[in-house]
Amino acid sequence: MHYKHILAAIDLSPRSQEVIDRAAEVAASNNATLDVVHVIEHSPVAYGGEFSIPINVNLEQTIESEARKALTELCHTVKVPSERQHTLSGVVKHMVIELAEKLNIDLIVVGTHGHHGLDKLLGSRANAILHVATCDVLAVWMKE
């Protein structure tokens, strides 16, 4: 299959470079456009457990700013321009799929490092994306 528009979904872990590099290889071999997305997923556990405590606006802005900076550094290595770099907030699978549909993506590249069941094979977020994606999904194994 020939891909025209690829989306790499990364978590900004140290192994995210492997995902971006693989996505860039596939994009280059298909002469495809490459976009990269990172989704900031706010966990209720991190902010007070079961109780809904509003996140500090300054903290949220700092997290987003640091995420954008890290994303820019990772994307620089494979020359992804800033207009093709996306930092979003929300539930990872929903935000990745929403962006993929908006951009008419035909391949989503995700990293995987899960630890049990299908999650071991794919990783929980990669598995979630695979089950709702309307395009091909390439799971890149990230070494522990």
Swiss-Prot record:
InterPro entries: Rossmann-like_a/b/a_fold, Universal_stress_UspA, UspA. Its main location: cytoplasm. SUPFAM superfamilies: Adenine nucleotide alpha hydrolases-like (SSF52402). It is found in: Cytoplasm. One of its GO terms (cellular component) is cytoplasm. GO terms for biological process: response to stress. It holds the Pfam family Usp. Keywords: Cytoplasm. The keyword Cytoplasm applies. The keyword Cytoplasm applies. Coiled coil: none annotated. Involved in stress response. Homodimer. Belongs to the universal stress protein A family. This is Universal stress protein A homolog 1. It comes from Coxiella burnetii (strain RSA 493 / Nine Mile phase I). The gene is uspA1.
